């Protein structure tokens, strides 16, 4: 399994959580973004910088993705592509996307995007909190534990 990190909007508070997990389990990790994102120093982490442009990082992740790989992303359309390709996706707030729930999240995202574009909603997502980081750490840990059990 490879861990892919969609680095474009990764909260800094998650970097040490990811680094500890990657180092502890020696998980091959690819951070993909249109600029350098420093997660930490580890031989397990590879930084891939893509050119500027819509969906360039997303396209690279999908190109490199194998079934059973895990993608960390806040991008719901990317999560949908990952699930369709047989991968797994977790967002920064600890939501684990699956074939059972991704279409619901995608529909809600599209609805709110339409409402924002019409000017009815002007605020963005709520601020990222320590509670969100804790939920993310728990979801990542649970996923990696299930993976380790399958290896045995």
Swiss-Prot record:
HAMAP family in UniProt: UPF0178 (MF_00489)
Protein name as catalogued: UPF0178 protein NIS_0137
Similarity section: Belongs to the UPF0178 family.
Alphabetical list of InterPro entries matching this protein: UPF0178
Top-level taxon in the UniProt lineage: Bacteria
Source taxonomy: Bacteria, Pseudomonadati, Campylobacterota, Epsilonproteobacteria, Nautiliales
NCBIfam families in UniProt: PRK00124.1
């Amino acid at each position: 399994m490879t861990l892919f990190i969609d680095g474009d909007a990764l909260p800094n508070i998650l970097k040490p959580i990811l680094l500890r997990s990657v180092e502890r389990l020696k998980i091959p990790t690819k951070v993909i973004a249109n600029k350098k994102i420093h997660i930490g120093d580890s031989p397990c982490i590879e930084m891939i910088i893509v050119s500027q442009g819509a969906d360039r990082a997303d396209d690279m992740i999908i190109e490199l993705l194998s079934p059973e790989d895990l993608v960390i992303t806040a991008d719901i359309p990317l999560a949908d592509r990952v699930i369709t390709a047989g991968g797994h996706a977790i967002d920064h707030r600890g939501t684990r996307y699956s074939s059972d729930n991704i279409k619901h999240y995608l529909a809600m995202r599209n609805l709110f995007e339409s409402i924002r574009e019409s000017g009815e909603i002007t605020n963005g997502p709520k601020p990222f909190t320590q509670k969100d980081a804790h939920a993310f750490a728990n979801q990542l840990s649970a996923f990696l534990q299930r993976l380790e059990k399958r290896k045995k």
